[in-house]
Amino acid sequence: PRPTWISEPTTDMDGDGCRDSDEDDNDDADDFEDSQDNCPTTYGTSTLGRVGCTDSDLDGWADSHDDCPVEYGNSSQNDKIGCLDSDGDGWANVDDAFEYEPTQWTDTDGDGYGDRQEGVDADSCVDDSGDSYADRKGCVDSDGDGYSDPDSSWDIGDGADAFENDDSQWSDFD
C-alpha cells in the first residue's frame, strides 16, 4: 500500500521528508532535539538564555535574552547580557567604568580608582572622591601633593599628609 501522507511545509517544517508529528525529533533541523529546544519550530543556534532559538549576532545568547541582539558580545553581569565586554570581566563596556581592566568595573565616587579592593588600583576611600595616590589611592588630598589628608581611620603615623594644606611638604619625622 502506498502511504497517504504527503510532505508539505505545514506537516514537515524542515523538509526532511519525515512527518513532524510522529517521525521527526528535530522539526526545525537546528541540531537541537525538540525536547531540548525552546523554539522547536524555528531554526536557531542559541545555547544561552534559551536553547535553539534565533541568535542574530551568533554570540550564543538567544535574541529574546540578548540586550544587544545585533552586536556580538560576551557580557553576563549586571543588566546587560550579550553586549560587548572588552576585558572579559562579564560587565558590558557601557556599564564598565574600566572597560579594559578585568579586575575593576565600578567607581562609585568617580575618582578613577576602582571599588573592588582585590582589584588593580583599588580605591582606599570608595565613598569619598579624591586625588591622592602616594599613600592611599582615591582619597581627599586638599593640597594636591599626592598624599591623602588624615582622617579617623588613617593618620600621620599611617602615612597621611602631615601638612594637608602645604603642597611642598607631607611628612615630618623629627
What are these regions (language model features)?
Residues 1-174:
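Extracellular calcium-associated, cysteine-rich motifs in secreted modular proteins
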